[in-house]
């Protein structure tokens, strides 16, 4: 379609052309562009690092120190899962529709699920139950807002894909929260997931916009939030032992674990590795930590080996820059 036609024209088919394109962006890009790329590509790096140990018990696998093959989905090293695929769908929709459009977004999610669009291997993997049910409802009757299903609606599927919204709307703190909520509601009928998305969007938007991470956290702590999220916000993450950190698919656990990993490290790589080595829902904890750490440290701080080993890294980088146009 036109979007990837534009990406191809910009990036070309060779690594050298992509290198030239990066140089072009680096010359004209601000520190904000660097943090935007860090957040978006960082999501994918955390996803790819964590994918091979997703569902693994903490301490029950060799320490993750870089990309590796295998895991439940038997992916090649550097390949990513639903976290990144859905983020690409969201980014593509925001660009093509010049803003948020629930129907277009759900159509793109359906293309990913049914036809393997926007995947790293040509096959969709890792879809969550909330998303699966919602897309079923969308295909059957065009439902654009997720409906509650039993008691399990508080998954992390809308949090993991959030970065594109922040990349688009970081300079409007009210709108970035509104759009974070809107994209969450397409697949998750959960006030808790909604609020976690709003919080993370506000945090990342402030950091991308130039605030320090500490100031952004302090400013957001003064706002009113519901109990499960407020407990995360008020938690002393630097003092928390790893044994106290849950890395489950519950959205509050995921956000808490990602913040813990970021606040107990001093670099992008350190944050995402600390996150994925928690195990359990490792790819999504890694993806959320990657978004936060990428926004803090920027794309330029990411080690070359993490860029070189990531499947479709060129497309991910360029997509992040199209979100800023």
Name these PLM-found stretches.
Residues 1-325:
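Structured, active/binding-site neighborhoods that engage oxygen-rich ligands
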């Amino acid at each position: 379609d036109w979007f990837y036609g534009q990406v191809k024209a910009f990036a070309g088919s060779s690594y050298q052309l992509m290198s030239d394109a990066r140089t072009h962006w680096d010359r004209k890009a601000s520190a904000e562009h660097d943090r935007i790329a860090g957040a978006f590509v960082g999501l994918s790096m955390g996803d790819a690092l964590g994918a091979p140990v997703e569902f693994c018990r903490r301490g029950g696998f060799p320490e993750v120190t870089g990309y590796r093959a295998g895991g439940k989905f038997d992916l090649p090293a550097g390949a990513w899962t639903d976290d990144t695929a859905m983020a690409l769908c969201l980014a593509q929709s925001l660009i093509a529709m010049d803003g948020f459009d629930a129907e277009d977004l759900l159509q793109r999610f359906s293309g990913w699920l049914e036809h393997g669009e926007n995947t790293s291997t040509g096959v969709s993997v890792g879809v969550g139950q909330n998303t699966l049910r919602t897309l079923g409802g969308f295909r059957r009757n065009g439902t654009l807002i997720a409906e509650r299903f039993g008691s399990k609606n508080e998954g992390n599927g809308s949090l993991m894909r959030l970065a594109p919204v922040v990349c688009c709307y970081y300079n409007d703190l009210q709108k970035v929260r509104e759009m974070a909520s809107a994209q969450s509601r397409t697949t998750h009928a959960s006030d808790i997931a909604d609020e976690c998305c709003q919080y993370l969007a506000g945090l990342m938007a402030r950091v991308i916009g130039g605030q320090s991470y500490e100031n952004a956290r302090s400013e957001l702590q003064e706002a009113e939030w519901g109990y499960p999220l407020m407990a995360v916000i008020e938690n002393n993450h630097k003092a928390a032992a790893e044994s106290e950190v849950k890395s489950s698919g519950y959205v509050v656990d995921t956000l808490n674990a990602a913040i813990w990993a970021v606040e107990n490290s001093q670099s992008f790589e350190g944050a995402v590795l600390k996150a994925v080595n928690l195990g359990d829902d490792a790819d999504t904890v890694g993806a959320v930590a990657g978004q936060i750490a990428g926004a803090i440290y920027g794309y330029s701080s990411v080690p070359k080996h993490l860029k070189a080993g990531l499947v479709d890294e060129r497309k991910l980088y360029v997509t992040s820059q199209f979100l800023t146009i």
